[in-house]
Amino acid sequence: MTFESFTVLPAVDMQDGQVVQLVQGERGTERTYGDPVDAATDWVAAGAEALHLVDLDGAFEGARANATAVEDILDATDVSVQVGGGIRSAEDATALLDRGVDRVILGTAAIETPDIVGEIAAAYSDGVLVSLDAKDGEVVVEGWTEGTGMDPVAAAQRYADLGAAGILFTDVDVEGKQEGVRTDPVRDLVDSVDIPVIASGGVATVDDVRALEAAGAAGAVVGTALYEGNFTLADAQAAVED
C-alpha cells in the first residue's frame, strides 16, 4: 500500500498476548480487548484495508514477546500490514519484511542508529516507516518514556532524506484520552516532507478523522475509539470518502 488515498488503520496493540489500548502510552492504564488474531480478522471482515500492529512488550522491553501473534495475523489476513514495537536491528526488520509484512515501523532503532533506515530502504524501498512519537513537542523513545531533545519536524526531514517511505506520527499528549486530535503538529509535518504522514493519537469521533485528512495526513491509526464503539470502521471510511 502506498497511501494513494486516505487510509483508516485499526490498531492492534498487543501486550501479554492481548489487545490493549493505553492512555498516553503509560503502562498500568491499559484497557483489554481480547485476542489479537480475533481482533485483526474482525477488522478485516469489517472492511479494513490495512492493519497497524504494535508489540508493546517489544516497545517497552526490547524483546518481541508477541511475535507469534504477528505471524498468526499474517497467516489469517490478506490486507496490508505494518508492524512496530521491539524492532531494534536491520535483521529484525528484514525478517518481518521477508515474512510478508508490508512496512516495518522503526522508532528507537531509527533514533539511535539513523543509518538503519537507509540500509533497509535500499532493499525494501517502501518498507520503512519511521515512528516519531512526540510529547510536549519533543520526540520520545523507549515506549514513550525517554526524551531525545529532537524536534519532530527536523527529525522527519532527516528520515525522509535517509529513505523512509513515510512517517508515523503519534501525538502522545492526546493518545488514548478520547479528547480529540491536534491537527497543527500533523500539518507541520505534512508541510515539511514529501513522504506520507500517518497520524495517530486522540481520535474520538469521525470529525477527528476528517480533520486529519484535511490536515494532509495520508492515513490515521485508530484504536480506542473503534474498540469502545464511538463509531464503526465503516463510519470512519465513509467520512473521508464524502
Swiss-Prot record:
Matches recorded under Pfam families: His_biosynth (PF00977)
Active site per UniProt: 13, 133
Enzyme class per UniProt: isomerase
SUPFAM superfamilies noted in UniProt: Ribulose-phoshate binding barrel
This protein's GO CC annotations: cytoplasm
UniProt GO MF annotations: 1-(5-phosphoribosyl)-5-[(5-phosphoribosylamino)methylideneamino]imidazole-4-carboxamide isomerase activity; oxidoreductase activity, acting on the CH-CH group of donors
Catalytic activity: 1-(5-phospho-beta-D-ribosyl)-5-[(5-phospho-beta-D-ribosylamino)methylideneamino]imidazole-4-carboxamide = 5-[(5-phospho-1-deoxy-D-ribulos-1-ylimino)methylamino]-1-(5-phospho-beta-D-ribosyl)imidazole-4-carboxamide
Keyword terms, alphabetized: Amino-acid biosynthesis, Cytoplasm, Histidine biosynthesis, Isomerase
Main location: cytoplasm
Entry keyword Cytoplasm: yes
Organism domain of life: Archaea
Known pathway: Amino-acid biosynthesis; L-histidine biosynthesis; L-histidine from 5-phospho-alpha-D-ribose 1-diphosphate: step 4/9
EC number: 5.3.1.16
Subcellular location: Cytoplasm
BP-aspect Gene Ontology terms: 'de novo' pyrimidine nucleobase biosynthetic process; L-histidine biosynthetic process
Protein family (similarity comment): Belongs to the HisA/HisF family.
Protein name (database record): 1-(5-phosphoribosyl)-5-[(5-phosphoribosylamino)methylideneamino] imidazole-4-carboxamide isomerase
Organism in which the protein naturally occurs: Halobacterium salinarum (strain ATCC 700922 / JCM 11081 / NRC-1) (Halobacterium halobium)
Upper taxonomic lineage: Archaea, Methanobacteriati, Methanobacteriota, Stenosarchaea group, Halobacteria
Gene name as annotated: hisA
